[in-house]
Amino acid sequence: MLSRPSSRFLSTKRGPGPAVKKLIAIGEKWKQKTTRGLPKQDTLNSGSKYILCQFPYPSGALHIGHLRVYVISDSLNRFYKQKGYNVIHPMGWDAFGLPAENAAIERSINPAIWTRDNIAKMKQQMQSMLANFDWDREITTCDPEYYKFTQWIFLKLFENGLAYRKEAEINWDPVDMTVLANEQVDAQGRSWRSGAIVEKKQLKQWFLGITKFAPKLKKHLNQLKDWPSNVKQMQKNWIGESVGAELVFKVADPKFENLIVFTTRPETLFAVQYVALALDHPIVQKYCEEMPDLKEFIQKSDQLPNDTKEGFQLPNIKAVNPLTKEEVPIFAAPYVVSSYGSAPSAVMGCPGHDNRDFEFWQTNCPGEHIKTCIAPFFDDASKVTEQERQRIIDTVPFTSTDGVLTKECGEHSGVLTVVARKSIMGMLNSEGLSKSVVRYKIRDWLISRQRYWGTPIPIIHCDNCGPVPVPESDLPVKLPELEGLDTKGNPLSTIDEFVNVACPSCGSPAKRETDTMDTFIDSSWYYFRFLDPKNTSKPFDREIASKNMPVDIYIGGVEHAILHLLYSRFIAKFLGSINAWSDPAGIFEPFKKLVTQGMVQGKTYVDPDSGKFLKPDELTFVNDSPDGNTVIIKSNGKVPVVSYEKMSKSKYNGADPNECILRHGPDATRAHILFQSPIADALNWDESKIVGIERWLQKVLHLTKNILSLEKDLAISKDYKTPTDLNDAEVKFHNDFQRFLKSITESFEVNLSLNTVISDYMKLTNILESALKKGEVRNEMIVQNLQKLVTVIYPAVPSISEEAAEMINSQMEWNQYRWPEVERTTESKFKKFQIVVNGRVKFMYTADKNFLKLGRDAVIETLMNLPEGRMYLMNKKIKKFVMKFNVISFLFHK
């Protein structure tokens, strides 16, 4: 057994060989030029392209997932620049947030210092991978020059009634001591950031009225033709449109207001047996003041599972069914969602026709009778036995929306549910007890965070005036500089000089808002700021934004389908509604085409006995295995279980992109990332396979050198056109080259199949190499197509392209950046004809494709004069002669 080198086992990795060292050196040689981009190309495409990848949080280190996104966006950026477009390809930093604050606490420094240091490191890493970003457009969300306008947007939302403060039940992260939006709590009830079990608290919070835009957010998804269907479906599900009715349940106690209950099935009113209220409902809160048992129930409710069926019946209070006038009990129930936004805070319970209500009733009222009001409908055509019919009728709950109302439903008895639904609504509408509405599951966006490192909310609280917006002339409300953070929670509330201010309205002593904004607000509008980053008077110029929006291609992870993408759509639509930008389509969508790249997964090794994840130094190779590549566990000689999983420190399967670039060079790393997987699919990272890419890059350089050595004085005019007098080999060479050139162009422009781009590059290289070896294609054509190859590889492997172009430029002048036009395929002027004698092919003859038009006698005479013709055709009497397509047939007398 012998340890052998592998990228997975860095401790045993040998250094690169001479050929790979050359690739690394070429990357370093051209780094400055390639990261600056390329000259503007003058072509027919004078329009613009806005290509944007989701900007990163400045953690200080890029991971392979980052690298994948940036290689995709940079390749598209370079391609469209070569096509002559004015490409906007900016980069910035999503710099506020908990990680920086927590890091600052650990180091006792200001988070701004930690953030700036990390940005400098990550910019250097981006340059190492040859990324060409518009650094003159760079933005950082923690800069006052940026968050000044985040605050401006908040004030506009406040001005339009879309930013408001109210007490609500919130998700509290006990580790980070801050509030989380619903989207930041996972299915297990844990914080997306700290992993802590989230608690429920009542707290005054700031919300943004995203629910007001819910109809447009849902409707306009249908017009996003270039978005992945799974992302659109996730947003539709999150928005959650329901068409139904708001019903008025009067409360049998005059000191309480009526209950507004939303339902999609008013026909089940005949079977309502209770009403359930959210824990923050005013009635529940009123009872809570007088009932310690209820208060304890609410306090413990955050420990219950999300689908809990526990409830607390409120004493001495009933709700009146608007249809039957029957009084039913009222429960406080954790399963009922809170009241902010468009979500209901009161629901009616029908145990006989809803599974959840059935379980709730059995939990809280065990053994009590269950009402039903809908029975299955069997028409004459129903092929159901009487026994089966009875079984269906006796099943409780009966949850089908199709059926007939039972005899207990008075004048509605025997009526189909769909008919009864309309008639019941008509009756209740006439009494003012119902109205048809569309409700949405989405709730208003909770943006308050009780932390320091975020955008301050520009509101001042005055005892006389209430919440007062900070005047625009006083923006930005700057974060006070702190040398070190030594506590969790909200340090802003402890800084008197920040908190204590005069009211802008009346001048009285007042208090500044100490909550900061959710960082998703910072990233909800950054794509606008990139277009006009130096503007000091407004977030962006209306004309500039209207000209360049929406973003043409937006690249990022599917994990942001609900959070960032939904919030960005909301803010873009809001800014459109206040005329901050115009959209000819009238839908104000920020991203035209969305590209969601798959996750990069690392090779993971697990001990088959213990299930323990194995570190690289716990593994070795077997050199006498059939493939010479079998990994075993050093301690016991067993073969580990191998799989590809999400990269993480705990699984020891991470990969450092900077190390990969140092070992293989930037071009090989870039091409390897593109080649390994289609963009939307997961990428199983295996650095050992990069050797194929390295060989191809070396072949490109060797091929360039060999082709240019054909004739030292060979020069190709800039206006060189493919000749028309091509031989068969040249026709095939030309057609094959154009076929792959077309495929590459379409892969960039149409289907973003960048993995096939790399394979097509390799095929073009092989076509040139084959033509050079065979010597059947004239040198000028080979050189011309070498130039095209060097040009089209530039988006993916820019420094190798530059190196090859430098060799070519030493002998001739040409535009190495302009993307070549795909030429039409051509046909040979010659054709191969089969010469058939008495039913058997005797020989082939290549002639002008119009050879048969010479006529019978001329064709026969020509063939007779050939050596093969004299052998097979001379001195024989023709019985039948046929010329058709590429066949010339002789039938001779015996």
From Swiss-Prot:
Temperature and thermostability: Optimum temperature is 37 degrees Celsius.
Motif ('KMSKS' region): 646-650
Keyword Mitochondrion: yes
Binding residue positions for ATP: 649
One Pfam family here: tRNA-synt_1
Motif mapping: 'HIGH' region: 56-66
Keywords: Aminoacyl-tRNA synthetase, ATP-binding, Ligase, Mitochondrion, Nucleotide-binding, Protein biosynthesis, Transit peptide
Catalytic activity: tRNA(Leu) + L-leucine + ATP = L-leucyl-tRNA(Leu) + AMP + diphosphate
Enzyme class: ligase
Gene3D superfamilies: HUPs, Isoleucyl-tRNA Synthetase, Domain 1
EC id: 6.1.1.4
Organism: Saccharomyces cerevisiae (strain ATCC 204508 / S288c)
Chief site of localization: mitochondrion
Biological process, per Gene Ontology: Group I intron splicing; leucyl-tRNA aminoacylation; mitochondrial translation; mRNA processing
Name the record gives this protein: Leucine--tRNA ligase, mitochondrial
Transit peptide residues according to the UniProt entry: 1-9
Influence of pH: Optimum pH is 8.0-9.5.
Gene Ontology CC entries for this record: mitochondrial matrix; mitochondrion
Keyword Transferase: no
